[in-house]
């Protein structure tokens, strides 16, 4: 039986949808999800659960089946920013501060970055009080939101443009090299899958990522924002 390879448009739609689905399925089981159940049962379907929150005051938040976390929220924020244009400025000055009004499950680095822009109109690396925390932020918050950049750069032959966009995005919230490498590595893998027009062989993606480390692991231009 012949296998039909999805078109790039179908892959993009599927990836965006799968992002939200995977987020909604996995969020209750994350160690930092603040799930009231300490060891929740892992399910392959959406569940309702209760999350313990402390902002603006201690309370229990009801999470309905299929609702997603900050990972999908920020993915959509990046997508909207790209659609609007001048995405770096729109993401940092509009989307990120406004996200504080509806955020769910945001990590420490992301929250600090958003609050710094919202309260002081400055990025974390511009603040002498937050520089240490910023350059120690090596989580996967940036990697979780870079899918829209892969989609936006799908028609470009040179992957360096995608890597630059991912680095710019990461810079807004994270400063540790691990955060950059995680985001660029993941973006490279997604880009490879998007361009693949035959059935993926066993181990092929791992080999492709290893072989492509000169692309996703390259030292970036020190002045990526042109400032």
Regions flagged by a language model, labelled:
Residues 1-227:
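Structured, active/binding-site neighborhoods that engage oxygen-rich ligands
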């Amino acid at each position: 039986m012949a296998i039909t390879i999805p078109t790039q448009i179908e892959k993009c739609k599927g990836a965006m949808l799968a992002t939200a689905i995977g987020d909604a399925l996995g969020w209750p089981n994350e160690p930092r999800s603040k799930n009231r159940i300490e060891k929740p049962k892992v399910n392959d379907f959406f569940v309702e659960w209760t999350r313990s929150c402390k902002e603006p005051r201690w309370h229990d938040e009801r999470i309905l089946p299929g609702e997603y976390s900050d990972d999908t929220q920020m993915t959509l924020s990046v997508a909207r920013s790209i659609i609007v244009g001048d995405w770096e400025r729109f993401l940092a000055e509009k989307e990120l501060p406004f996200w504080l009004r509806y955020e769910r499950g945001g990590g420490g680095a992301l929250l600090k970055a958003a609050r710094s822009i919202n309260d002081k109109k400055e990025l974390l690396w511009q603040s002498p009080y937050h520089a240490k925390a910023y350059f120690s932020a090596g989580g996967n918050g940036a990697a979780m939101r870079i899918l829209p950049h892969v989609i936006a750069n799908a028609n470009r032959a040179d992957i360096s443009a995608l890597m630059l966009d991912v680095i710019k995005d990461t810079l807004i919230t994270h400063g540790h090299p691990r955060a950059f490498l995680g985001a660029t590595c993941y973006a490279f893998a997604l880009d490879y899958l998007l361009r693949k027009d035959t059935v993926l062989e066993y181990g092929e993606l791992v080999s492709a990522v290893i072989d492509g480390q000169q692309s996703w692991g390259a030292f970036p231009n020190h002045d990526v924002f042109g400032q």
